[in-house]
Each structure stands twice: as structure tokens, then as C-alpha cells.
Amino acid sequence: MFKTFIIAAVAVATVRAAVIGHDQVVPFAQPTPTSISQTTAVNFKPQLHITNGCHPYPAVDADGNTSGGLNPTGSSSAGCKGSGYGSQIYGRSAWYNGVWAIMYSWYFPKDSPSSGFGHRHDWEHIVVWLDNPAVASPKILAVSTSAHSGYTVYYPPNSNYLNGKSAKIDYYSILLINHAFRMTSDAGETQNLIMWDQMTDAARTALQNTDFGDANVPFKDGNFESKLANAWYQ
């Protein structure tokens, strides 16, 4: 009887999760931190400036429903100038080579530098490298920003690129080259942060298994560790 109940519950969960409209995904509220790592991630949450292209959207909801994204048609920001439900920034952190790494990621429904160019879905991310999250005043050692399957490393970042503890990040494209991140002196906006370990099982499973086409979830298992290695600043 118990086994039957478990199978039925899994079946219901599987049925409930679906690909839905990019503007129908409800983001997670930002939880109250319950650990040093979560508190540090909130304290160093970056801000995002959009030079051109889509604004960030939530990629997954608590039930595991994922965004269907957008075709790269119309202007670079057509149909994706912001969700009525609010946006989301995703985080995951770990020690790497004796340094504390916080990966912050954003999802965009399309990466379209110009009408007809680009692709559905875009994931971009940064890694903020800290000396130690447990000390009274952790220090930013470097920031690595994703750019066309590689990284631009700011070691150390220019003070104009920081607002206190918050790195200022720009989402941009030039001509017909797909979007990327860079640091900027321009102020941006922040989004509610949800860490990998704060998500529901359904959301983690969805991000782990969903095919986002030419984009990939940088912080999921199997990607997170290799991305940190590639983003390493030394």
C-alpha cells in the first residue's frame, strides 16, 4: 500500500511539471538565510544592468514547471522586458582552491542580438570569489563573468564596478554577437535570490533535466564544478 502511494505521488509530481509560457513562471520568494553561506550570498548579491536584450526572468517555479523561452524574433527585447511576477537570481556556493566561490546565475527567455539571430533561452552567470565567508568582513578577491562559453576575469575588480559588496554586471551584445556579461560602472537592479539548496526538489530536478537548447544551467550538478574550474581567476 505504501509503495503504491509513493509511486502515485511521483506520477502526480511528474504530470504537474510542464513547460509553460516564459511570462507565467512564478519566481521563488527570497528565503530568510539559515546558514553562513546563505547569508553571505545575500550580502554579496550583485546588480544587473541591461544594455540591450531581454530582462531576466524566472526559469522554474516551485512545482518544477520551466520556461518555454522565446523565439529570437522581433527586437532583442521584444516580448521579454520583464515578468509581471518578478524576476529571479540563482545562486550556489562552495570552496574552490581554498577560496569561497559564489556563482550567481540569471535566465533570459532568448538570446537575440538582432531579429532572426540568436537562439531560444539564455543562461549567463558570474562567480564572485571571496577570501572567507566566515570572517567578519569577507573580501572580494575577483569576479569572473560569463562570455561566449568562456570568462572575463576581473582580478581585482575596479572599485567603480562595485557598489559596496555588490558587483555591477552588464548584459550586452555587440552587432550580431550573442549576449554576454561584463562588469560595469552603471548601476543595475537586484532580484530575489534563491540558492540551489533552498529550492524544492521539483525545481532542482527540473533544472537538472530540462533541455534549454543552446543554453545550459551553469549551477546544476555536473556543470557547477567544471564552471568554477574554467572561471578560476589565477
From Swiss-Prot:
Glycosylation site list: 65
GO cellular component: extracellular region
Residue ranges of coiled coil: none
Major localization listed first in the record, in broad terms: secreted
Signal peptide annotation: 1-17
Source domain of life: Eukaryota
Chain positions of motif Conserved undecapeptide motif I: 101-111
Family annotation (InterPro entries): NPP1
Pfam families (alphabetical): NPP1 (PF05630)
Keywords of the record: Glycoprotein, Secreted, Signal, Virulence
Motif (Hepta-peptide GHRHDWE motif II) on chain: 118-124
Subcellular location: Secreted
Family: Belongs to the Necrosis inducing protein (NPP1) family.
Its biological purpose: Secreted effector that contributes moderately to virulence during infection by P.capsici. Does not cause visible reaction of C.annuum for several days after inoculation, but by 7 days after inoculation, small necrotic lesions become visible. Leads only to chlorotic areas, without necrosis at 7 days after non-host N.benthamiana leaves infection.
Domain notes: Key residues/motif important for the effector activities are degenerated in most NLPs, including the nlp24 peptide consisting of the conserved region I (11-aa immunogenic part) and conserved region II (the heptapeptide GHRHDWE motif) that is important for phytotoxic activity.
Name used for this protein in its record: NLP effector protein 10
Species in which this protein is naturally found: Phytophthora capsici
Lineage: Eukaryota, Sar, Stramenopiles, Oomycota, Peronosporales
The encoding gene: NLP10
